[in-house]
């Protein structure tokens, strides 16, 4: 069993904001493979099967800073024993250039409150992350910046990278995280 988590904030107000790039990736994954999310408890959920692997995809509705609450519920329900290889979290990264994708096996939250919430809730830093750079505006407060929408020029670039992130998920599932890191961390 694999659990994929796209991080973001629920509601129309946040739908197109930089902080919701994790939601955008799992929405694109669902669109590409004909999956439909259903609301359940503190998250939206859909199930997928790829290469004989059962996969659960969620979008927490707890708001970013409490994402760990929803993730822990799903992890406990699905009884993930091999956590590092079984949990994939997709999120934005303000410290990376716009559109840069970086896949990591584990590590700190890097200041991302949604990731920190997951670390705190699960009691481990050992899970796969797909980080997508959203850039940074030195003239704008970080919290204001991440909650603002992409410009139309940025949107075109980020859409291309969202598709790459979906491809990277498939590589992780089919060929492993090391192969995905070798491919996508170089781009």
From Swiss-Prot:
<feature type="active site" description="Proton acceptor">
    <location>
        <position position="19"/>
    </location>
</feature>
<keyword id="KW-0963">Cytoplasm</keyword>
<comment type="similarity">
    <text>Belongs to the PTH family.</text>
</comment>
<protein>
    <recommendedName>
        <fullName>Peptidyl-tRNA hydrolase</fullName>
        <ecNumber>3.1.1.29</ecNumber>
    </recommendedName>
</protein>
<feature type="site" description="Stabilizes the basic form of H active site to accept a proton">
    <location>
        <position position="92"/>
    </location>
</feature>
<dbReference type="GO" id="GO:0005737">
    <property type="term" value="C:cytoplasm"/>
</dbReference>
<feature type="binding site">
    <location>
        <position position="63"/>
    </location>
    <ligand>
        <name>tRNA</name>
    </ligand>
</feature>
<keyword id="KW-0378">Hydrolase</keyword>
<dbReference type="InterPro" id="IPR036416">
    <property type="entry name" value="Pept_tRNA_hydro_sf"/>
</dbReference>
<dbReference type="GO" id="GO:0004045">
    <property type="term" value="F:peptidyl-tRNA hydrolase activity"/>
</dbReference>
<dbReference type="InterPro" id="IPR018171">
    <property type="entry name" value="Pept_tRNA_hydro_CS"/>
</dbReference>
<comment type="subunit">
    <text>Monomer.</text>
</comment>
<feature type="site" description="Discriminates between blocked and unblocked aminoacyl-tRNA">
    <location>
        <position position="9"/>
    </location>
</feature>
<comment type="function">
    <text>Hydrolyzes ribosome-free peptidyl-tRNAs (with 1 or more amino acids incorporated), which drop off the ribosome during protein synthesis, or as a result of ribosome stalling.</text>
</comment>
<dbReference type="InterPro" id="IPR001328">
    <property type="entry name" value="Pept_tRNA_hydro"/>
</dbReference>
<dbReference type="Pfam" id="PF01195">
    <property type="entry name" value="Pept_tRNA_hydro"/>
</dbReference>
<dbReference type="GO" id="GO:0072344">
    <property type="term" value="P:rescue of stalled ribosome"/>
</dbReference>
<comment type="function">
    <text>Catalyzes the release of premature peptidyl moieties from peptidyl-tRNA molecules trapped in stalled 50S ribosomal subunits, and thus maintains levels of free tRNAs and 50S ribosomes.</text>
</comment>
<keyword id="KW-0820">tRNA-binding</keyword>
<keyword id="KW-0694">RNA-binding</keyword>
<feature type="binding site">
    <location>
        <position position="65"/>
    </location>
    <ligand>
        <name>tRNA</name>
    </ligand>
</feature>
<dbReference type="GO" id="GO:0000049">
    <property type="term" value="F:tRNA binding"/>
</dbReference>
<dbReference type="GO" id="GO:0006515">
    <property type="term" value="P:protein quality control for misfolded or incompletely synthesized proteins"/>
</dbReference>
<feature type="binding site">
    <location>
        <position position="14"/>
    </location>
    <ligand>
        <name>tRNA</name>
    </ligand>
</feature>
């Amino acid at each position: 069993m694999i659990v994929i988590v796209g991080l973001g904030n629920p509601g129309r107000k946040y739908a197109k904001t930089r902080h919701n790039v994790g939601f955008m990736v799992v929405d694109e994954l669902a669109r590409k493979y004909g999956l439909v999310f259903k609301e359940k408890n503190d998250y939206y959920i859909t199930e997928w099967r790829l290469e004989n692997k059962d996969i659960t995809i969620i979008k927490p509705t707890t708001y970013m800073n409490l994402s760990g609450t929803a993730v822990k519920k799903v992890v406990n329900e699905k009884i993930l024993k091999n956590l590092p290889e079984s949990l994939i979290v997709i999120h934005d990264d303000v410290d990376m250039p716009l559109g840069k994708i970086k896949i990591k096996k584990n590590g700190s939250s890097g200041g991302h409150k949604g990731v920190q919430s997951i670390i705190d809730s699960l009691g481990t830093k050992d899970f796969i992350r797909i980080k997508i750079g959203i850039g940074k505006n030195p003239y704008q407060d970080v919290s204001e910046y991440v909650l603002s929408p992409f410009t139309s020029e940025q949107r075109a670039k980020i859409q291309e990278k969202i598709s790459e992130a979906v491809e990277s998920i498939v590589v992780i599932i089919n060929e492993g995280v090391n192969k995905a890191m070798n491919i996508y961390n170089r781009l």
